[in-house]
Design a protein with these regions (language model features):
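Bacterial N-terminal signal peptides that target proteins for export
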Residues: 1-8
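Bacterial N-terminal signal peptides
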Residues: 9-16
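Sec/Tat signal peptide C-region and signal peptidase I cleavage site
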Residues: 18-22
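Active-site catalytic motif of lipid deacylating hydrolases and related acyltransferases
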Residues: 23-98
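Serine-dependent carboxylesterase/thioesterase catalytic core
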Residues: 27, 79-185
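Catalytic metal-binding/acid-base residues of hydrolase active sites
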Residues: 33, 106, 137-139, 205-208, ...
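C-terminal catalytic-base region of ester-bond hydrolases, centering on the histidine
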Residues: 192-288
Length: 288
């Protein structure tokens, strides 16, 4: 009898260990507005990507997405491209769990997939594997700066590096347009059904651009200065591109920058860079 009990215990332990071993987690980094062909270097940069990779048991289970996010979020070159790359990633790496980290408008494209499972036959499997989306500075309720670009005012040329020039993704991020999309096509905002997986916002609250402030230099001083200028056309709480109310409009707020960065703020450029411990925050969350 004792032998049988021992055998059963060993069998249970073996099953438990093999089950735990079989759980494979992957992380996908999804860029914001722009037509990316090398987002690793051009959008995120190596320090950010490799810092996030540190959270994975298998460091090969990381995907840096490259798609044309100058298009409307539902376009085959935007959500269709993203769905294709995520599907291939899940299949080739044999993933059980998928964590997606988005920046800016990338959160809208991901939210389109999560909100519209019947739009594309690939969406349901992605949603099934999706554990959570960590949305860095998402433009969930749009930005007045998109309205400014479409209106063709004097700031259009100054915003080109940040947003683009009158493309469909910029049109989509106008405040009124995003309000309509949120009411009719997207889940996760106030008064709408919840998203099928956690959508957690990281909110940038300010811009520091002082010449003698070390905070201003992370991610590039000139970018910080540019965001300080654009912040003048936004509410008092913004990262220079996205107002806090927009960044926190969908899902739930994971944290506001200063709560986890030792008091440093994350402007809209810094929230995609290895600034103020952000890669470690994300990596530790993946491990958790």
């Amino acid at each position: 009898m004792q032998r049988i009990k021992r055998a059963l215990s060993l069998l249970s332990l073996t099953v438990a260990c093999s089950t735990a071993h079989a759980t494979v987690t992957g992380v996908a980094l999804v860029h914001g507005t722009g037509n990316q062909t090398n987002a690793y270097s051009d959008y995120w940069q190596a320090d950010m990507v490799e810092g996030v990779r540190n959270g994975l048991t298998d460091r090969n289970n990381l995907l840096v997405v490259n798609c044309d996010f100058t298009q409307y979020m539902w376009d085959s070159r935007a959500a269709g491209c993203l769905a294709g790359q995520l599907t291939s990633f899940i299949q080739t790496r044999h993933l059980d769990r998928l964590i997606v980290i988005t920046h800016s408008n990338g959160g809208n494209v991901m939210r389109w997939i999560m909100s519209n499972p019947t739009w594309d036959a690939r969406y349901p499997a992605i949603i099934q594997h999706l554990v959570k989306v960590d949305a860095l500075a998402p433009s969930s309720a749009g930005t007045p700066l998109a309205d400014a670009v479409i209106a063709g005012n004097v700031f259009e040329s100054a915003l080109g590096w940040l947003l683009g020039y009158k493309n469909d993704a910029v049109r989509q991020q106008q405040v009124g347009w995003m309000a309509t999309y949120n009411q009719q096509y997207l889940l996760g905002t106030a008064g709408r059904p919840a998203l099928p997986a956690a959508f957690r916002d990281v909110v940038g609250t300010d811009v520091v651009s002082g010449l003698f402030s070390s905070q201003a230099y992370c991610g590039g001083y000139t970018n910080s200065v540019g965001l300080e200028i654009t912040q003048n056309w936004l509410s008092s709480c913004s990262d220079g591109f996205i107002e806090c109310s927009s960044a926190s409009a969908a899902g739930t707020v994971w944290f506001r920058d200063t709560q986890k960065t030792g008091g440093s703020v994350l402007n809209h450029n810094q929230s995609r860079r290895a600034c103020f411990g952000l890669p470690s925050i994300l990596a530790n969350d993946i491990k958790g």
